[in-house]
C-alpha cells in the first residue's frame, strides 16, 4: 500500500486495510457526522450495505486497467496480471474431484496482495455520487442530509448506482 499512500491514491473515506484506519474509525466518523446533523436539527437518511462475494467478483481485466490508471505500470503490473491469470478451481465431494475450470474474476483471499488489489478495484466507488460514502473494504455506509424529497431521490439514485 506504500504506492497508494505515497501518492494519496485511495478514497479518503476507505478505512479497510490502511494504516491508522479500522472498522471502528469508519463507525466513529459516521456517528460523529450523524450526531452533528442531529445537533443541527437535520435529518440524515442512512443505507448500510455489504456487497456479497465482493472479492470474488473483481474483474481481472478492469483491475489491471485501474491499476495502470493509478500509476502501477510495467513489470509490476505485468507481475500482478501473472499473479491473477491462469488460476483454476475444482470442487471435491466425497473424494471425487470435478473438472478444473478457469477463474477469470476475483482476487485470491488469504493472499498478501488480495486486500490491496481489492482496494484499487473499489477505489472509484464514490465517483459521481452526492451522498457521503464511508467504507471498510466493501462494507459501505451511504448517507445524506434530507431537506426535501429531492434529497431522498438523490440518495436513491446513489443507491441505484452502487448496486450496479
Question: What does each model-found stretch correspond to?
Answer:
Residues 1-14, 115-144:
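Active-site palm subdomain of RNA-directed nucleic acid polymerases
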Residues 30, 117-121, 155-162:
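Hydrophobic alpha-helical membrane-association signature
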Residues 110, 114:
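Short, conserved phosphate/pyrophosphate- and ester-handling motifs at nucleotide-, phospho-/glycolipid
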Residues 1-108:
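Conserved pre-catalytic core of RNA-dependent polymerases
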Residues 20-23, 115, 152-155:
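Flexible, glycine- and charge-enriched loops at secondary-structure boundaries
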Residues 9, 43-46, 132-133, 151-154:
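Short, surface-exposed helix-loop/turn micro-motifs enriched in polar/charged residues
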Residues 53-70, 141-164:
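Catalytic palm subdomain of template-directed nucleic-acid polymerases
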Residues 34, 51, 87, 125, ...:
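Hydrophobic alpha-helical packing residues
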Amino acid at each position: 500500500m506504500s504506492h497508494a499512500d505515497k501518492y494519496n491514491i485511495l478514497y479518503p473515506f476507505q478505512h479497510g486495510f490502511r494504516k491508522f484506519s479500522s472498522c471502528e474509525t469508519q463507525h466513529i466518523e459516521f456517528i460523529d457526522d450523524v450526531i452533528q446533523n442531529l445537533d443541527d436539527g437535520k435529518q440524515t437518511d442512512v443505507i448500510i450495505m455489504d456487497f456479497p462475494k465482493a472479492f470474488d467478483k473483481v474483474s481481472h481485466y478492469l483491475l489491471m486497467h485501474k491499476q495502470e490508471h493509478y500509476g502501477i505500470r510495467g513489470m509490476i503490473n505485468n507481475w500482478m496480471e501473472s499473479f491473477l491469470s491462469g488460476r483454476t478451481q475444482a470442487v471435491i465431494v466425497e473424494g471425487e474431484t470435478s473438472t478444473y475450470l478457469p477463474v477469470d474474476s476475483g482476487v485470491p483471499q488469504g493472499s498478501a496482495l488480495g486486500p490491496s488489489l481489492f482496494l484499487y478495484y473499489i477505489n472509484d466507488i464514490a465517483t459521481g455520487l452526492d451522498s457521503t460514502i464511508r467504507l471498510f473494504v466493501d462494507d459501505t455506509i451511504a448517507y445524506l442530509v434530507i431537506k426535501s424529497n429531492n434529497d431522498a431521490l438523490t440518495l436513491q439514485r446513489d443507491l441505484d448506482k452502487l448496486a450496479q
